[in-house]
From Swiss-Prot:
InterPro entries documented for this protein: ATP-grasp, ATP-grasp_succ-CoA_synth-type, ATP_grasp_subdomain_1, Succ-CoA_synthase_bsu_CS, SUCC_ACL_C, Succ_CoA_ligase-like_bsu, Succinyl-CoA_synth-like
A molecular function (GO) term: succinate-CoA ligase (ADP-forming) activity
PANTHER family assigned: SUCCINATE--COA LIGASE [GDP-FORMING] SUBUNIT BETA, MITOCHONDRIAL, SUCCINYL-COA SYNTHETASE BETA CHAIN
UniProt keywords, alphabetically: ATP-binding, Ligase, Magnesium, Metal-binding, Nucleotide-binding, Tricarboxylic acid cycle
Binding note for cofactor: Binds 1 Mg(2+) ion per subunit.
Gene3D superfamilies given in the database record: ATP-grasp fold, A domain, ATP-grasp fold, B domain, Succinyl-CoA synthetase domains
Amino acids binding Mg(2+): 209, 223
Ligand binding (ATP): 46, 53-55, 109, 112, 117
Gene name as annotated: sucC
Protein name (record): Succinate--CoA ligase [ADP-forming] subunit beta
Its biological purpose: Succinyl-CoA synthetase functions in the citric acid cycle (TCA), coupling the hydrolysis of succinyl-CoA to the synthesis of either ATP or GTP and thus represents the only step of substrate-level phosphorylation in the TCA. The beta subunit provides nucleotide specificity of the enzyme and binds the substrate succinate, while the binding sites for coenzyme A and phosphate are found in the alpha subunit.
The protein's required cofactors: Mg(2+)
Amino acid sequence: MNIHEYQAKALLRSYGAPVSDGRVVLKADEAKSAAGELGGPLWVVKAQIHAGGRGKGKFKEPEAGEKGGVRLAKSVGEAAELAKQMLGRTLVTHQTGPAGKQVNRIYIEEGSDIARELYLALLVDRGTSRISFVVSTEGGMDIEEVAASTPEKIVSFSVDPASGLSDFHGRRVAFALGLEGAQVKQCVQLVKNLYRAFVEKDMEMLEINPLIVMTDGNLKVLDAKVGFDNNALYRQSDVMALRDETEEDPKELAASKFDLNYIALDGEIGCMVNGAGLAMATMDIIKLYGAEPANFLDVGGGATKEKVTEAFKIITSDPNVKGILVNIFGGIMRCDIIAEGIIAAVKEVGLQVPLVVRLEGTNVEKGKEIIANSGLNVIAGDNLSDAAQKIVKAVKG
């Protein structure tokens, strides 16, 4: 789960991280009073969406102006006008895709005198099963660009959970960032605070880009992006309260309410599978035979007829889907239950695209019989390879 920048900064402030004072604006008529509560003489007006690249982004609507989603104002009135221009408009960045995201919140904060821009992130390293620090002197730009053009400017290391975080980790970050004197001490404390927030709040990723050195020599968190482990949200009620469902894919949101693991992709063949490994294998074989999967969808091991029906509704709500492949290996899940769910779903949604079903495992013969006697136009797949070839042929011709 992701949160907005202003929420991330409030959270980090509660852990002692140095951040600028700011106000969130939900309505245009709130902007002037919000900016007036801040000191100035410079105000930064930021569009709040769950995507990076806001500063370099462009709004679809001409009324929003030609600049991106991060703008500078030199007066309270100008800050209010900029907020009014951006609220309700659609911001397109390299992370939103061409559709963009509607800006429903604006964050106005005090400007900062910047001497240097740095990069600091914490993330879960799947390879080592540890929390890793990623730091670079090249802050203020996409870390992917730095990794591609000047990888030597990125330093990363992990923290052994057995011994935990120590001061030397903070000093290592400070020296990698070229800090010196009192800045090193500041950095050590900041690293401690960020690490504690990361662990206590079950974060998956904490990115500060940029972390700035101000002209007075002090450090400040200028932008923050935080992602949380969905599997740990049950014990993070305060984090759950920060969730903004308007920023989430409607299909993924609907799937989460039925405990379906769904991720939207860009292809044309919808997939419904039980088990993450089998789902990935199904997507791979679709690509092998020349097509692209439209989604990852794992219905899990205990799917009911209602759950299968909901899965079909989610898949067919994607206008890019030209065909559907159902691939079920019945272990805990019975193939006859899946078959009943498929029939009910096809009848309810009025399926207009080709459907290939491959069943194997518990009660497979019952499942195949239910589908065969349904009178519906469902193509049977003998095995995974056969099913994949049939759906690709049905879609591609």
